[in-house]
């Protein structure tokens, strides 16, 4: 988004002319310049938006592929199957549990926060990372991403707050299958700060007043903004109410990925901006 603060400068340019020509020329020039600025800004935003969208799409596609790789790993399938058969107190499970430490290498390789395994009933039976103690033994049966995954559908969760790990998260859930039956899921917590940074990377190409941020259907910020009072400690804490939110809200709720809008509106700082809106 780029502020429109050009009218004063253009009007001053015509003070040396007669009154009527000044008003007419200033009006025409201002509107022509405004139109040109909008077109130029929209062009920059389109290029940036397309590049950014492709980058985000490629990132999540790579994580889906990472999840698929894990779901095809025999040691993981065998571990979950053993847990389902013998239970957590069995000698068989205790031996395999130790072997699952190899998943730490995949956390590093795939650049994840954590990998965790869930049995067929929704109980987490193994996890990596600093939140391991919170995740293991926790009940995930009510999570939509688990319900979809245990039904055979690989999926990416929405941004949400977890009462288990006490932070906002996004996860990739992939079903584990053996002999034609879904026996559990392998799940990956993605690094939320990295996703937030990726969304805003390169916004400077639009201009010094360029801004980009992610919101939900109620205007809750999923990222900090680049400018203003919401540039720090605002993600998942602050909401905005703008024309952009009004336009996006119903489209987000219906999942209309084809929706786009380009035009003028007042942003969260009260400034008139050229904005480009889309649903991802």
Which positions does each model-derived feature cover?
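Short N-terminal helix-loop-first-beta-strand/juxtamembrane motif that initiates sensory/input modules
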Residues: 62-73, 104-124, 154, 201-222, ...
């Amino acid at each position: 988004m780029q502020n429109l603060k050009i009218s004063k400068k253009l009007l001053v340019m015509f003070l040396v002319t007669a009154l009527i020509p000044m008003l007419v020329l200033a009006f025409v020039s201002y509107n022509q310049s405004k139109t040109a600025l909008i077109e130029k800004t929209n062009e920059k935003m389109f290029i940036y938006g397309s590049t950014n969208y492709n980058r985000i799409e490629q990132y999540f596609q790579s994580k889906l592929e990472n999840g698929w790789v894990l779901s095809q790993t025999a040691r993981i399938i065998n571990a979950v199957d053993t847990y389902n058969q013998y239970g957590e107190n069995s000698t068989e499970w205790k031996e395999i549990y130790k072997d699952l430490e190899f998943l730490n290498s995949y956390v590093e390789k795939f650049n994840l926060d954590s990998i965790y395994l869930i049995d067929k009933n929704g109980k987490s039976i193994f996890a990596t990372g600093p939140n391991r103690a919170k995740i293991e033994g926790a009940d995930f049966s009510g999570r939509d991403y688990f319900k979809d995954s245990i039904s055979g559908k690989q999926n990416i969760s929405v941004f949400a707050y977890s009462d288990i790990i006490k932070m906002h998260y996004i996860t990739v859930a992939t079903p584990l299958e053996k002999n034609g039956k879904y026996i559990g899921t392998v799940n990956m917590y993605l690094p939320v700060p990295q996703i937030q940074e990726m969304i805003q990377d390169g916004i400077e190409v639009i201009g010094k007043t360029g801004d980009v941020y992610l919101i939900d259907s109620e205007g809750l910020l999923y990222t900090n903004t680049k400018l203003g009072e919401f540039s720090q400690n605002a993600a998942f804490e602050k909401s905005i109410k703008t024309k952009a939110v009004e336009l996006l809200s119903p489209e987000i709720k219906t999942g209309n990925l084809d929706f786009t809008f380009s035009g003028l509106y007042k942003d969260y700082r009260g400034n008139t901006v050229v904005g480009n809106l889309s649903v991802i």
